[in-house]
Amino acid sequence: MSLDNIRDQIGKYILTDGMSQIVDLGKSHGAWLVDARDGKEYLDLFSMTASMPVGYNHPYVLKNQDRFISSALNKPANSDIYSNEMADFVTTMGRVAQPNYLPYAFYVEGGALAVENALKAAFDWKVRKNLADGKGEKGSKIIHFKECFHGRSGYTMSLTDSSDPRKTMYYPQFDWPRIDSPKIHYPLDDQSLQNVINSSGVKVPSE
């Protein structure tokens, strides 16, 4: 297909309000995205919404692509039936990323659903703790920052402070407390850094 027609062709079937670049998946490398139209390289600072943390065409991935192809051909229900590939995966994740004080992992496919499952765990833990302390069935509110994005699935819509309210205006949401984010603005100066320090509760003695 002609590169000039790709965006129009996709636009026949879905909303195309994304970036203008047409990614060349074969030539992109490391943290650099290559535009298929002109070969220009862009430093990918969002790594495809954090779905490509090792970058494009990582040497290890290319060397072991047969393993990845085999896994991509089939999508088993990993919560119900197991495979050698799954055993390798959970063993590696357990060794590399799982701390000893958290013996069990719960894998979720996608950021919004990962946030939702973290919320469920927090609700369950907090309410049980309050019940045990005689405080009643409390602990079902989530404090969160303004101008944040955690997804647009069920619970996460109540956390996402969308820059375009039309996207969620008719969806029911929980009235959870939303607070200012202690962000910094460039250029950095003594005052902006002091604001961050103060918001974290750190008190720096005057000279």
Question: Where are the model-predicted features located?
Answer:
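Short, acidic, Ser/Thr-enriched surface-loop or helix-capping motifs
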Residues: 35-37
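Generic alpha-helical secondary structure signal
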Residues: 4-8, 59-63, 84-87, 191-194, ...
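Glycine-rich loop-to-alpha-helix module at the N-terminal edge of alpha/beta enzyme cores
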Residues: 12-14, 22, 41-133
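PLP-dependent aspartate aminotransferase-fold enzymes
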Residues: 91-207
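Short loop/turn motifs at secondary-structure junctions and domain boundaries
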Residues: 20-29
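Short, P/G- and charge-enriched loop/turn segments at secondary-structure junctions
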Residues: 17-21, 165
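Short, compositionally biased leader-like segments
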Residues: 1-18
